[in-house]
Curated annotation (Swiss-Prot):
Keywords: Lyase, Pyridoxal phosphate. CDD domains: D-Ser-dehyd. GO terms for molecular function: D-serine ammonia-lyase activity; hydro-lyase activity; pyridoxal phosphate binding. The keyword Cytoplasm does not apply. The gene is dsdA. This is Probable D-serine dehydratase. The lineage of its organism: Bacteria, Bacillati, Bacillota, Bacilli, Lactobacillales. The keyword Nucleotidyltransferase does not apply. Belongs to the serine/threonine dehydratase family. DsdA subfamily. Gene3D superfamilies: 3.40.50.1100. Pfam families: PALP. HAMAP family: D_Ser_dehydrat. The modification N6-(pyridoxal phosphate)lysine is found at K111. It catalyses: D-serine = pyruvate + NH4(+). GO terms for biological process: D-serine catabolic process; isoleucine biosynthetic process. It comes from Lactiplantibacillus plantarum (strain ATCC BAA-793 / NCIMB 8826 / WCFS1) (Lactobacillus plantarum).
Length: 436
């Protein structure tokens, strides 16, 4: 691709090539659009989650206290806020919250929403086709041996850098599906170990994520009884994430967080392939409308959604096309080509994007432990990096009546040794800043 022509049309690409953090403001935000999905699709997904709640409560006792509903807390960050202000040398007039998907049950990440949902839907389809299960039945019956034997005749395949593999792998193996995960070179070892411990077959490929997906897709295509979870374009994954809009609306009400034209809410979502943040953002906008503003956060080395949306080439361009290496410590964001759905559905719904340098992730995750005793993995701290640049770009989102929600996408299942390494690196980087 001719980057000279691209830079003429989109001058910010020069900054992307130089790996400098930028804010990209979406020129199409708020325009009318014919979207491929509707609110009715979201409520269909809500109903399916509720049908499966009795099964989840039995299969995963950690969900029993919530009656089988998988949801994360919305945490006020009263101690983190002054720490953020000190790090950024500026005040944060509004309120700061963490949407702690890092604490979601079963797989400890935002992927619990989409990955688990898609497996639930596949299990429902298989059960409906081959048994007398009805939509009004108690779905806890799906945890019995009869259904386990049925599901064992079917397979599930997914390609992932890590967290989607955990959610799909653990859920599919629990049903009894023959489960295979194809993983790229940047997947963390502990995630591979966890999957194998749950009876999942892990195929490791020494290539990047975008190259793994076609291999996984081809493997699934060889067997009519195998379902492929497509992180680049799955409608069901997308709708599983979108249910977050319904859930967050309720949490805002319960916690007395006002949202109207004078009290906007900004939501900061880390983006890799763009599937999970797009699904969540779609749900937020469909359910709550004009006064909630989604922002995507991406590494300077892998700004795939930013590049795809800026050029309107979407999945037809990868970060390597402009000379970037696609490497980042944020393993869940190490995706060089955006999903087919991300750019298309987000075209009028996404306020913009902000890119960040990896070191900042460690600084924020360490501060989050020190101030709130909350543990997240590096990519889950990405939202903190976007607050200052977004407030600078959009002064109306910098006032005292604004609520800022950082979406922490994963981290609860990290081994203690991994957490400690991340924390210590954050400490070193913070010391470096203090010694300047």
């Amino acid at each position: 691709m001719d980057t000279t022509v691209m830079i003429e049309e989109h001058p910010q690409i020069k900054e992307l090539i130089a790996k400098r953090p930028i804010v990209w403001q979406n020129p199409d935000y708020g325009k009318r659009a014919d979207l491929p999905l509707t609110r009715a699709d979201i409520f269909d997904a809500v109903a399916r989650w509720e049908r499966f709640a009795p099964f989840l409560a039995v299969a995963f006792p950690e969900t029993a206290a919530m009656n089988g509903i998988i949801e994360s807390p919305l945490l006020p960050l009263e101690q983190m806020k002054p720490a953020w202000e000190a790090l950024n040398h500026q005040s944060l007039a509004g309120q700061l919250y963490l949407k702690a998907d890092s604490q979601l049950p079963i797989s400890g990440s935002i992927k619990s929403r989409g990955g688990i949902y898609e497996v639930l839907k596949f299990a429902e389809q298989v059960a409906m086709a081959h048994t007398d299960l009805t939509y009004m039945d108690d779905y806890s019956v799906l945890a019995t041996a009869k259904y386990h034997e049925l599901f064992a005749q079917y397979g599930v395949i997914v390609a992932s850098t890590g967290n989607l593999a955990l959610s799909v792998g653990i859920m599919a193996a629990t049903f009894g599906f023959k489960t295979t995960v194809y993983m790229s070179h940047d997947a963390r070892q502990w995630k591979k170990d966890k999957l194998r411990a749950n009876g999942v077959t892990v195929e490791e490929l020494n290539t990047d994520f975008s190259s793994v997906i076609p291999v996984a897709r081809a493997a699934a295509a060889k067997d009519d009884h195998t379902h492929f979870v497509d992180d680049e374009g799955s409608r069901d994954l997308f709708l599983g994430y979108a249910v977050a809009g319904v859930r967050l609306q309720h949490q805002l009400k319960v916690q007395g967080i006002k949202m109207d034209a004078a009290h906007p809410v900004v939501v900061y979502l880390p983006a890799g392939v763009g599937g999970s943040p797009s699904g969540v953002a779609f749900g937020l906008k469909m359910i709550m409308g004009a006064n909630i503003y989604p922002v995507f956060c991406e590494p300077t080395h892998v700004p795939s959604v930013t590049l795809g949306m800026m050029t309107k080439l979407n999945e037809k361009i990868a970060v390597q096309d402009i000379g970037l290496d696609g490497l980042t410590a944020a393993d869940g964001l190490a995706v060089s080509r955006p999903s087919r759905l991300a750019g298309k559905v987000m075209r009028t719904l996404l306020l913009g994007t902000a890119t960040f340098e990896d070191d900042d992730l460690y600084r924020y995750l360490t501060k989050l432990v020190d101030t709130e005793d909350v543990i997240v993995e590096p990519s889950a701290a990405a939202g903190f990096t976007a607050i200052a640049p977004i407030m600078a770009q959009f002064p109306t989102l910098a006032g005292k009546d604004v609520t800022h929600i950082v979406w922490a996408t994963g981290g609860d299942m990290m081994p203690e040794s991994e957490r400690q390494l991340d924390y210590e690196l954050g400490q070193k980087l913070l010391t470096k800043i203090n010694n300047r």
